[in-house]
Amino acid sequence: MTIAIGQEEGRGWFDLVDDWLKRDRFVFIGWSGLLLFPTSYLSIGGWFTGTTFVTSWYTHGLASSYLEGCNFFTAAVSTPANSMGHSLLLLWGPEAQGDFTRWCQIGGLWAFCALHGAFGLIGFCLRQFEIARLVGIRPYNAIAFSGPIAIFVSVFLMYPLGQASWFFAPSLGVAAIFRFLLFIQGFHNFTLNPFHMMGVAGILGAALLCAIHGATVQNTIFEDGDAANTFRAFTPTQSEETYSMVTANRFWSQVFGVAFSNKRWLHFFMLFVPLAGLWTSAIGIVGLALNLRAYDFVSQELRAAEDPEFETFYTKNLLLNEGIRSWMAAQDQPHENFIFPEEVLPRGNAL
């Protein structure tokens, strides 16, 4: 038996904090939690406050709260007024000057929720990195979550930064998001954008892959117990595989002629397809922020400028977008005071 005599090595405050943050508890905190929990709490709390009490009369000329009679679908935390530009709208800034009521009236809650929400999503991504490191697994969950972060940052932050003000970002509400979709189509023709096409292919393709994968696994689960359902027969510590990859491979080989034979490649493909869709959509939105739009595959305006004999022509797509713009603009951008004479508005039977 050996007895070591000596003074215990002193532990610094960083080690003590590290131990406390990573302690095994019902809800893991971690270093990422220092960013995740405060920002998420403030963002979600700000959204509930705004949708319950705060009007959009001074920014959009709209009612947008439960207090004004809105429901879950029509309530929103609306974007700041166009005149605010790209100001951070700090409560103590020159616009509100510490007046909370005035801060809410000019749209300060939207900037508050959007910025804290972005940092909350980043904190959640870092949380997945941190827990993956502690558990000893690869960090692909965190990498996959970069997709939603890219979408949020591009739509709520980068798009309005490329436009005139925060006003043109989506307001934080259900109907408000659909309004933004119509706006993006009418003013940018986003459905004809190849980045949007890649995004649609990625998201719908991922949904198809998810359905096929789930059904195939359920179809090929081994009968490893006599319980009434398959869930009770499964044990999380079993050494053998739960379903037959060989049988699944044989099935899809017969159906399509080709099939995945490697689980790693199969699941990486299921990670790659939706993530590629999310990222390409985000890149497309950044393009819209810079007004890199294409109203048609070949711009009629450019051709008309080069060829004096070329006559521009309407397509149903152009007419539809023109209708969206003229229908939305007057109410959607009240600060512009648009007034359209009846003779220039698209007629209802023009399609």
From Swiss-Prot:
A GO CC term? chloroplast thylakoid membrane
Q: Which residues bind Fe cation?
A: H213, H267
Detail which positions bind a plastoquinone.
H213, F260
Xref: InterPro entries: D1/D2 (IPR055266), Photo_II_D1/D2_sf (IPR036854), Photo_RC_L/M (IPR000484), Photo_RC_L/M_CS (IPR055265), PSII_PsbD/D2 (IPR005868)
Q: Which Pfam families match?
A: Photo_RC
Q: Which CDD domains match?
A: Photosystem-II_D2 (cd09288)
Q: What is its EC number?
A: 1.10.3.9
What is this protein's name?
Photosystem II D2 protein
The free-text cofactor remark is:
The D1/D2 heterodimer binds P680, chlorophylls that are the primary electron donor of PSII, and subsequent electron acceptors. It shares a non-heme iron and each subunit binds pheophytin, quinone, additional chlorophylls, carotenoids and lipids. There is also a Cl(-1) ion associated with D1 and D2, which is required for oxygen evolution. The PSII complex binds additional chlorophylls, carotenoids and specific lipids.
| Source species | Guillardia theta (Cryptophyte)
Example of a GO MF term:
oxidoreductase activity
Q: Where in the cell is it found?
A: Plastid, Chloroplast thylakoid membrane
